[in-house]
């Protein structure tokens, strides 16, 4: 009988350990998913900001060259 009790206890401990490992794995995956999402949002924001800066710089350059062209009578 004692052997049966020890076997049951062993199975219970193994089951509890497996549940703990599964829960830890799920928590780790959630952290990875959140970090991935945060990284993607940061990259999206960086791309947006970079494009806005490029557009602004291009517009400023265009305005500058247009002003120079008008000043020297090259543009109307």
From Swiss-Prot:
Induction: Up-regulated during pre-adipocyte differentiation. Up-regulated following DNA damage induced by UV irradiation. GO terms for cellular component: cytosol; extracellular exosome; nucleoplasm; nucleus. Expressed in adipose tissue (at protein level). Highly expressed in omental and subcutaneous adipose tissues. Expressed in heart, cornea, liver, kidney and spleen. Keywords: Differentiation, Nucleus, Transcription, Transcription regulation. GO terms for biological process: cell differentiation; positive regulation of fat cell differentiation; positive regulation of transcription by RNA polymerase II. It is found in: Nucleus. Plays a role in fat cell development; promotes adipogenic differentiation and stimulates transcription initiation of master adipogenesis factors like PPARG and CEBPA at early stages of preadipocyte differentiation. Its overexpression confers resistance to the anticancer chemotherapeutic drug cisplatin. This is Adipogenesis regulatory factor. The gene is ADIRF.
């Amino acid at each position: 009988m004692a052997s049966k009790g020890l076997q049951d206890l062993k199975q219970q401990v193994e089951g509890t350990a497996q549940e703990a490992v599964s829960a830890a794995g799920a928590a780790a995956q959630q952290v990875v998913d959140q970090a991935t999402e945060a990284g993607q949002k940061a990259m999206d924001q960086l791309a947006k900001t970079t494009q806005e800066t490029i557009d602004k710089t291009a517009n400023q350059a265009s305005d500058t060259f247009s002003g120079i062209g008008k000043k020297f009578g090259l543009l109307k």
